[in-house]
């Protein structure tokens, strides 16, 4: 029986137990069927595709056991965007973005605020954010004034907001409340590193309380660094619907993926056949 990607997408789109659709794809097959189904179903359920073959060698490896030629990668990217599909590059990203979209609202823009108790992870997160298509949010004058009143004089005075190593759970909670009210921010990434004065469990508990005021307005992500030593705090955040990550750069990239998905969904429209016809399948 010949079953196309379009058939599967329509089937899973109608399945009430399926909340999101993740696809590993080596060839697109019937491009018209895929794009027609995806553009319809993506409006109600996220469709995430991991398609290897970006490099010439990987494309050749895929062709060796599928017997099909891979289409031009840039054309496939355009096709995925046109029909509201999000393409990721790693298996880990498939599951992380599905979880994130299920827990947090999509950002309205690409501007992220990073709140951290250590400068290094903030810098690494910034590189990852900008490298994946996001941008740091500008801190408004009101936001700066409120943070100046809350934090020691030698805080970073910029985004990422470095609370410094002695940040208490209450400092974290108040800083996040302030950051969430910043009109120029579309999302918040909270980073905690284990330091001598850090209480990762109580900090997570206070953030979970604050998040109730923010939920639904902009996405919140967290990176609780420290392995088993911060596990209790991570569990508290997970139960509060805040996705947690081992490393802050991964979290920053997930925010960018969320924004890309939002853009793709907003641009779903009638499929232009000349794009489909350029796909080799």
Model-derived features: positions:
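Catalytic-core regions of core metabolic enzymes
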Residues: 1-281
């Amino acid at each position: 029986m010949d079953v196309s990607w379009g058939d599967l997408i329509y089937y899973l789109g109608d399945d009430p137990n399926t909340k999101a659709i993740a696809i590993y794809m080596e060839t697109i097959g019937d491009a018209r069927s895929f794009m027609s189904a995806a553009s319809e179903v993506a409006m109600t359920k996220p469709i995430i595709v991991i398609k290897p073959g970006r490099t010439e060698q990987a494309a050749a490896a895929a062709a060796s056991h599928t017997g099909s030629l891979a289409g031009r990668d840039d054309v496939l990217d355009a096709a995925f965007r046109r029909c509201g599909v999000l393409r990721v590059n790693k298996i880990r990203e498939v599951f992380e973005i599905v979880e994130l979209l299920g827990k947090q609202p999509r950002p309205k823009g690409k501007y992220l605020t990073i709140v951290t108790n250590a400068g290094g992870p903030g810098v690494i997160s910034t590189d990852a954010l900008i490298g994946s298509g996001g941008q740091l949010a500008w801190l408004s004058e009101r936001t700066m004034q409120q943070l100046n009143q809350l934090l020691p004089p030698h805080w970073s005075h910029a985004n990422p907001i470095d609370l410094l190593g002695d940040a208490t759970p209450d400092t974290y909670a108040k800083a996040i409340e302030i950051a969430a009210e910043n009109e120029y921010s579309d999302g918040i990434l909270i980073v905690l590193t284990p330091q001598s004065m850090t209480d990762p469990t109580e900090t997570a508990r206070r953030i979970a309380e604050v998040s109730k005021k923010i939920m639904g307005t902009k996405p919140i992500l967290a990176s609780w660094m420290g392995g088993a030593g911060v596990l209790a705090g991570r569990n508290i955040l997970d139960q509060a619907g805040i996705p947690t990550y081992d490393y802050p750069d991964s979290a920053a990239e997930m925010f960018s993926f969320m924004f890309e998905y939002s853009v793709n969904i907003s641009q779903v429209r009638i499929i232009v056949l000349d794009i489909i016809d350029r796909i080799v399948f």
